[in-house]
Design a protein with these regions (language model features):
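Phosphate-handling catalytic cores of nucleic-acid transaction enzymes
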Residues: 1-454
């Protein structure tokens, strides 16, 4: 254990990181120091920062690297992420920090694009009135390459991805705006496109306003944004849990996080303030420099030890799923966990390579263990969010009615339980319908109900 590792361990213990549940120790030592520095100097939440860094690294890597899950099943690090928290707890600043190096690259690209566009327009202007034989040769039509998008229509998103086949990131402060956009375009199959994109399947876009239909054979779209606890239930109300879209998201929802008091940083610690920005830029720059060529796949395999760990972990979950005899009780989210976890393993391997702690020849056991622990954290966060929807978005008394019933019950039992709390039969029937729509309970053809096990 070197000096930095000891220092990080002591700082983590002093900061109470262990009580948060996030496995900060799975990150490279250089990144642990950076995350703890930001918590001290910028009041950033350790959990929001760590998650934002994972998302930004995935965006920087894009389609330049793949991981082989098994056989011919390979995937690039496509991650959909939501940061959940009450207003004012600082969800956005860590996200802005993580994506700043990519924002800076986009700013540079925009300046280059404007210069090339002006040059192109000037040549066109000079050619006016000249004979064709006297024309100056025109350079290729300038095209703007963007890594990050925050305001778009489905067509613009896919057009940009068609230009930047390495990948694009949808980074939005309030993610409800994105979900509202998706909901608005539901009839045009945008939801299905985003589901396919997360699976790494080809995405086709055919619109009457497109000169040529678009086809992205190997999509790599990152989605990340924040949401306030008070409106999380709207994601469920809009049907994003039911259609499986929400199942694909990694959730970070810190336990009992409150607004941190501002603390004055001594002047002698100025170097600490600057260090995280320098270190993170170096890491992202290494990831961005990874070569990408359309149609050529740089695939990292698991090491023998890593694949044993990954498969044993997955097979344990398969056993749990197979033990469920009632298909209605199977959680659809469970099927997405191994894919996201494999992608996390790839990211952690590249984190360690970028921090000079490892290589990028294959994904080793340490990265797989890191991914499994991080995946477990995300699933526990999701469970907290799920519980939040039930408790915050539901009338407390109505929740008590549901809690008073067994895991399986019939309408008559629900009506009786509702009457005990002063609800009329009609109100109870509306209540049951609402619980079904929120996927809290399931109703079979015989009119029997069963609680969904979270």
């Amino acid at each position: 254990m070197d000096a930095l590792e000891i220092c990080n361990k002591l700082r983590s213990e002093a900061s109470g990181v262990a009580t948060s549940g996030i496995p900060l120790d799975v990150f490279p030592q250089k990144m642990q120091q950076m995350i703890l520095d930001l918590a001290r100097t910028e009041n950033y939440s350790v959990e929001f920062t760590a998650t934002s860094l994972i998302s930004a690294m995935a965006a920087a890597v894009g389609n330049s690297c793949y991981i082989r899950i098994k056989g011919n099943w390979i995937t690039s690090p496509i991650l959909y992420v939501i940061l959940v928290g009450r207003p004012g707890v600082g969800k956005t600043p860590p996200l802005n920090f993580a994506y700043k190096p990519l924002h800076d690259i986009d700013t540079e690209e925009h300046h280059k694009f404007k210069a090339l566009k002006n040059e192109y327009a000037a040549i066109v202007e000079r050619n006016k009135g000249k004979k064709r034989t006297e024309w100056e040769s025109l350079p290729p039509v300038p095209v703007l390459h963007k890594n990050i998008m925050n305001d778009f229509t489905p067509e613009i998103l896919m057009r940009n991805h068609d230009v930047n086949l390495r990948g694009v990131a949808v980074v939005v402060d309030e993610i409800m705006g994105l979900f509202n956009t998706i909901n608005r375009y539901n009839n045009s199959s945008f939801v299905q496109q985003m589901l396919s994109a997360h699976n790494g399947l080809p995405v086709d876009v055919s619109r009457c306003n497109l000169d040529c239909p678009l086809r992205i054979d190997y999509p790599c779209i990152q989605i990340v944004g924040t949401i306030q606890t008070g409106i999380v239930h709207e994601l469920y109300d809009m049907g994003f849990k039911k259609n499986g879209f929400l199942d694909r998201f990694l959730i970070t929802y810190p336990k009992g996080l409150k607004i941190a008091p501002w603390v004055k940083v001594p002047k002698q610690d100025a170097a600490i303030i600057e260090r995280p920005f320098r270190v993170w830029k170096e890491i992202i720059d290494k990831a961005v420099a990874l070569p990408f060529t359309e149609g050529i796949f740089n695939v990292l395999d698991f090491s023998d030890e890593a694949i044993d760990i990954f498969y044993d972990w997955q097979n344990e979950d398969i056993e749990r799923q197979n033990a469920i005899t009632d298909e209605k009780m199977i959680d659809s989210r469970a099927a997405k966990v191994p894919l996201n976890t494999a992608r996390l393993a790839l990211i952690f391997q590249l984190f360690r390579w970028a921090c000079d702690e490892s290589h990028k020849d294959f994904v080793d056991a340490e990265s797989v263990n890191a991914a499994i622990r991080m995946s477990d954290y995300f699933e526990k966060s999701y469970k907290r969010m799920d519980d939040l929807v039930l408790t915050e978005a539901t009338d407390p008394v109505k929740k008590q009615v549901l809690d008073s019933l067994g895991n399986k019950f019939v309408t008559a039992e629900a009506v009786k339980a509702g009457a005990d709390f002063g609800f009329a039969r009609r109100t109870v029937m509306y209540m049951l319908k609402d619980f079904c729509q929120r996927n809290f309970i399931i109703k079979d053809k015989q009119g029997n109900y069963e609680k969904v096990q979270k």
